[in-house]
Each structure stands twice: as structure tokens, then as C-alpha cells.
């Protein structure tokens, strides 16, 4: 059985990152879109990133941000992976010069395979419940039966928590799951018990 990878997104505090790593998370997401409630300054993210143990990936999230800002953040944080959550064109994504994944707004895109075909350079696709122009981390979910078979890894997001992630994995068979609000006590503030329960549910 293939192991389902786990990404905790919206990390803003070193203590949350350390707890997540101790629990066995595979990747941590840092949001660099200023309008997000989970925005983190690049210097703060860099300090957290420097203390990550081996084999825990740092993911930088952007949503229709200015290319100069993206380049600035990448130069400071040096993320392992960049996640584009908006309406960025494939050329804009590739310009960052690092491996990248593209979010798919499932509330707006019916033909996911056709949308994904426009992003041939993506390392994978993150399927989230939001509509185009909306941010992730809303706690909403979508119909998991809509997850298509793609030629690259699929990361499942949107409304996941310890109570439903096992069912989501069984139904959608994603490469990875991504959670933010489902492990929080407030936006950007992670809850250790919820993190622990989420990882236990995935591994179980």
C-alpha cells in the first residue's frame, strides 16, 4: 500500500512547525499572499525553514502575486516547492525556477483534466474546494468522486480534518493530503491535538 503524504499549510509559528515535524509531517506550507489571514513574513518563514529536519519539505504558496514579490520571497526562503493558488499562467509558474504545483479551484473547473493539461510543467496538482479568486483554508470540501486520474500526483485539500480524511483517502486515493483550517484553533494557529489526530487518521 502506497503511503499518503501529509502537508500542513498556513504555518506561521516555529512551535507549530516543530510539533508538526515531531508528529511526522512530510511538508509544511507557508503563505506569502498578504491578503491571507495566514500570511507569514519571509524572514519568519526562513527562520522556521532553517530549523526543519531532513526530508521535511518547505512549500511557498502564492496567489496571483507580483513576480517581483515572488522572486524576493524565493530568494530569502529557498523553498523546496512553490504552490501557485491563483490564475497564474504556466509560463509564470515556470519562471520561478523551482519545482512547482498548481492548485485547481474545484468549484470553478468541471473538466479538471483539461485544466491540468495547460500546466505541463507542474510537479503535481492540488485540488481544493474553493472557486476561482477565492483563497484556500475555508474549511469547505468538494465531492471527492470528482477527483480524476491524472498523469502527475494529486494532492487533496479542502475541508479535511481528522474525522473525514480517512474516508477521503479511501475514496480519492490521492498522493498526498493538505490541511490548514482542520488542524487550527484560529487562522494560522495550529492545535497540537488536532495535528496529532489528523496524522493518526491518515496513517490508520
Place the predicted regions along the sequence by residue:
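Conserved N-terminal beta1-alpha1 strand-loop-helix module at the mouth
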Residues: 1-204
Amino acid at each position: 500500500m502506497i503511503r499518503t503524504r501529509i502537508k500542513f499549510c498556513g504555518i506561521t509559528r516555529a512551535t507549530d512547525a516543530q510539533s508538526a515535524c515531531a508528529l511526522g509531517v512530510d511538508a509544511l506550507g507557508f503563505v506569502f499572499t498578504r491578503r491571507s489571514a495566514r500570511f507569514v513574513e519571509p524572514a519568519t518563514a526562513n527562520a522556521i525553514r532553517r530549523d526543519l529536519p531532513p526530508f521535511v519539505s518547505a512549500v511557498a504558496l502564492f496567489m496571483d502575486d507580483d513576480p517581483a514579490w515572488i522572486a524576493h520571497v524565493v530568494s530569502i526562503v529557498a523553498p523546496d516547492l512553490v504552490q501557485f493558488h491563483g490564475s497564474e499562467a504556466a509560463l509564470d509558474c515556470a519562471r520561478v525556477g523551482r519545482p512547482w504545483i498548481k492548485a485547481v479551484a474545484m468549484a470553478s473547473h468541471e473538466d479538471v483534466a483539461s485544466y491540468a493539461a495547460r500546466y505541463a510543467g507542474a510537479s503535481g496538482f492540488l485540488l481544493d474546494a474553493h472557486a476561482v479568486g477565492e483563497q484556500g483554508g475555508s474549511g469547505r470540501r468538494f465531492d471527492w468522486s470528482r477527483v480524476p486520474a491524472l498523469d502527475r500526483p494529486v494532492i487533496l485539500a479542502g475541508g479535511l480534518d481528522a474525522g473525514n480524511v480517512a474516508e477521503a483517502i479511501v475514496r480519492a486515493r490521492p498522493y498526498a493530503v493538505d490541511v490548514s483550517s482542520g488542524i487550527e484553533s484560529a487562522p494560522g494557529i495550529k492545535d497540537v491535538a488536532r495535528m496529532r489526530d489528523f496524522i493518526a487518521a491518515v496513517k490508520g
